[in-house]
């Protein structure tokens, strides 16, 4: 606790967690309860905003690719989504300082781990084993349970995409069939969110379904370490101009999305041919402007960065990957995004959908103050 008192103690399995972040200096660590270690769950109220206090697994994340930039990018976005009333299932977090065998290891975020147990808790599902999860690693899509592309969930999802791509979804019956297989409100909100935050790692995805609910596919907000100002496929970071990019065209590109455009956009583009879904999607875009309101976002950036500012001085001194002043500059880059992203989002929304000024006012309350972007 704050006074140094021990709050929780348990023997758990610890293992390196993540994909490309395994190559970072500060690696993610998964904490997993195992009966062989004494307990099948970690029973403690780790997160103030969760009404459940039993966890099969947790993660300690140093923000992966954001570990040398701000250390708060992912928790910033997920926290604002949750507080803003998003229907997307976000991961709870607590900012912590990690010691390993008594050695100072630096600033981490304790997080819920996105898996079948996480979903069972969030949605009140009795049997975690009756949950299908599909995952993307930035390159390909597969089933999380190890069954790979022979998994029934993978095959069913592939069939859904093929149907959407080969049928006119402006037709009410065709659209209704697709709606019977996926939660279109969840999907519309997920896509609008990815575009607003300018995520350049959109291929790192997780989505799921369960017969215990309605067996519809739903998407999970996951891994925003490359959001806001990150340039895909490049080691260079533009901290004051990254928000200027047209993420509507990027995310909805016919060739695909993700760092290598390896993920199909057939489903979302087919759905956008339906006027009802198009209206829903634009409604969700308007919601993102509310959730990521400039003042709200800057206040949260200030809060999260202040929480770790003192520790980041020690952290940067220990690892030497970046200087403390560089961290401060990069946090300021997030503030710049908060100030400028709304206008560019509005501008590109109007350009992509060909909306009139009157339609912009009806949907968003206003049009962008920008008159042109070069």
Task: Label each region the model flagged.
Residues 1-147:
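Conserved ATP-binding subdomain of kinase catalytic cores across diverse folds
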Residues 5-25, 66-67, 96-99, 104-108, ...:
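Middle-to-C-terminal accessory/interaction subdomains
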């Amino acid at each position: 606790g704050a006074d140094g008192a021990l709050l929780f103690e348990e023997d758990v399995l610890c293992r390196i967690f993540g994909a490309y972040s395994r190559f970072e200096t500060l690696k993610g660590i998964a904490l997993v309860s195992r009966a062989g270690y004494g307990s099948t769950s970690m029973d403690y109220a780790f997160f103030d905003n969760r009404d459940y206090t039993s966890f099969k697994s947790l993660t300690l994340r140093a923000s992966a690719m954001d570990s040398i930039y701000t250390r708060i990018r992912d928790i910033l976005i997920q926290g604002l989504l949750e507080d803003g009333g998003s229907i997307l299932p976000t991961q709870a977090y607590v900012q912590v300082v990690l010691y390993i065998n008594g050695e100072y290891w630096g600033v981490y975020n304790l997080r819920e781990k996105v898996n079948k147990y996480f979903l069972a808790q969030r949605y009140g599902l009795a049997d975690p084993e009756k949950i299908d999860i599909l995952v993307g690693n930035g390159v390909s899509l597969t089933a999380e349970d190890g069954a790979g592309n022979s998994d029934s969930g993978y095959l069913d999802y592939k069939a859904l995409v093929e149907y959407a791509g080969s049928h006119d979804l402006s037709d009410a019956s065709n659209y209704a069939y697709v709606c019977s297989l996926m939660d279109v409100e969840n999907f519309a909100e997920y896509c609008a969110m990815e575009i607003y935050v300018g995520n350049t790692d959109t291929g790192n995805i997780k989505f799921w379904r369960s017969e215990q609910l309605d067996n519809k596919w739903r998407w999970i907000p996951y891994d925003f370490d490359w959001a806001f100002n990150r340039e895909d496929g490049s080691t260079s970071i533009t901290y004051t101009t990254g928000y200027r990019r047209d993420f509507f065209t990027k995310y909805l590109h016919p060739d695909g999305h993700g760092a290598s455009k390896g993920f199909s956009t057939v489903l979302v583009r087919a759905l956008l041919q339906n006027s009802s879904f198009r209206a829903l999607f634009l409604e969700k875009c308007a919601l993102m402007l509310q959730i990521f309101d400039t003042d709200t976002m800057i206040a949260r950036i200030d809060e999260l960065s202040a929480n770790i500012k003192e520790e980041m001085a020690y952290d940067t001194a220990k690892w030497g990957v970046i200087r403390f002043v560089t961290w401060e500059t990069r946090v300021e880059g997030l503030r710049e995004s908060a100030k400028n992203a709304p206008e560019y989002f509005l501008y590109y929304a109007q350009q992509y959908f060909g909306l009139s000024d009157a339609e912009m006012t009806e949907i968003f309350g206003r049009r962008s103050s920008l008159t042109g972007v070069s």
